[in-house]
Amino acid sequence: MDISTIIESDTHFEGDTSASITTQGGGAAANVATWLAHLGEDAYLVSRIGDDAHGDALQKEFNQYGVRHSGIKHPDEKTGIVVILVSPNGERTMFPDSGSNSKLSSNDLPPLDGFEAAYISGYPLINPRSRANVLAMIDQLKSAGITLIIDPGTVGALQKIPFQTIYEWLALFDVAILNESEALFISQRSELEAALTMLAAITPVVVVKRGSAGSASIREKNVITYMPADKVDALDTTGAGDAFTAGFISEWLRSKEIDSAMKVGGDNGRLCIQSIGARPPLGAIGKGK
């Protein structure tokens, strides 16, 4: 669950700052699942929620979006919450509490027959309480022949993890989707093309989200592609990267054309930043294509 605080003036620490506060569903994997549903895809969300008011609201929301899920609420566990501060220029700072998701395990996976791909947010890997169980889940997904896609997580979170460990995680995946600062940090390079080349030696397909500059990718034979972004005023950038990821996954699985996948990802991200929150508008579900 996301609690978004839209800051309307300069922040006065230890005092009052004018703001608009809203509550809405969030979480990287859940955001990607709802945007996939927006694009007409059959999405199943693997997560854990607590038996609380936030869990009730999220299950209702997933049902409205058409996102399949286990339907289980776990007693004596609290649903994860992220407090998001949104600056006057639309940029955000997040304070996450993963709650029940810290206990994710292979027992939370559905039967894997019929699934083509799995997107995994890096946050459960970064979280030491869920890491071992999530690595076991990845093992199970790989054994089932499912294409694996990762968004590794923010620089702030990844700074706690040794680089070699991050590289070992990335080597488990077929596609890595991350933003430019994350790509530069993980690769320990100062230039984007050098970062792409380094990361492509670990993960076969690497896609870098560049915000208003668009996106870039590298694939077999070190072919690098840039996709510009159409300009639009940003109301709230929360979830824009997740919306891009969903658009990319949807088109890439359909066509295996990275250029068109980057374009659909950018279109989806642009739609996201024109409203508050990380989810697509409910009235548009299944109408994104």
Which residue stretches match the model-derived regions?
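Ribokinase/PfkB-type carbohydrate-kinase core domain
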Residues: K60-H74, S87-I224
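Glycine-rich phosphate/adenosyl-contacting loop at the front of the ribokinase-like
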Residues: M1-V46, A53-K60, Q64, A234-L235
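Short, glycine/acidic-enriched loop or turn micro-motifs at the edges of active sites
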Residues: M1, T5, D51, T154, ...
